[in-house]
Amino acid sequence: ELDVLYLVDNSNVDNSKFFLNDKFEYIPLLKNTGIAHALNVGAKKALDSNYKYLLTMDQDSKFESDALKNMKNIIDNDIDKDTVGIYSPFHKTAISDPVPSELFTSPLVVMTSGNIINLDIYKCVEGFKEWMFIDCVDFEYGLNIRKHGYTIKQINTVFLDHELGNYEIKYFLNKKIFCDNHSALRRYYIVRNSFYLYDLYHDDFPDYCEAVKRQAKQSFFYATVFEKH
């Protein structure tokens, strides 16, 4: 279903010998420059090759059978596609909500993996913010395209299996607590970038930004009290 696959490798090792295929374009960065930079590298490669759409994937996700083909067919037949900045599948995780009954829903933000982004709109919003490095990069991009008047469509008949990593479920005052067990550095980026989102978009999306701020404080508390260090 893909014309070309860009493999952006942000490890410090050149793994090109494993990707000798005409449909692969392997791009070694030879250091971890952050998820936002890696996404921009792939997007600019696609733009240089005159592609209109880019599928973004994480290493911990996979589409269910024929899902990508179905997603492409739905997009091709969507009369609103020129104003849709992101088409997203339904992300199936250990903690995901029930699948909506509608074909399309319009979440305010979506996770990166499995998205098909409109590259004309990507250029309009000037891509992903590289100074964020990791965490909230995808949410910032979603808010940015919405601030510019574009939309996000989640296709609820297309499923992506997404692993959440080393999470645990614990209980506090009869309440279920999800602990993600991130490193201290990763926790720093989560909290820092959550507050950046608040500063950048509170005027446009106040309810969401207040929730992000609360969640950042809550996750820091859970990490301090419940997670192993």
Describe each region flagged by the PLM.
Residues 51-60:
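Short beta-strand-to-loop acidic/aromatic patch adjacent to the donor-nucleotide binding site
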Residues 199-229:
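Non-catalytic, C-terminal membrane-associated alpha-helical segments of glycosyltransferases
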Residues 121, 125, 131-164:
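A short, conserved alpha-helix in the catalytic core of glycosyltransferases
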Residues 2-28:
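Acidic donor-binding segment of Leloir-type glycosyltransferases
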Residues 29-46:
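Glycine-rich, basic loop-to-helix element that forms the pyrophosphate-binding segment
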Residues 40, 65-76, 122, 139:
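Short alpha-helix within the catalytic core of nucleotide-sugar-dependent glycosyltransferases
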Residues 66-99:
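Conserved donor NDP-sugar-binding/catalytic core segment of glycosyltransferases
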Residues 112-126:
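Conserved nucleotide-sugar donor-binding
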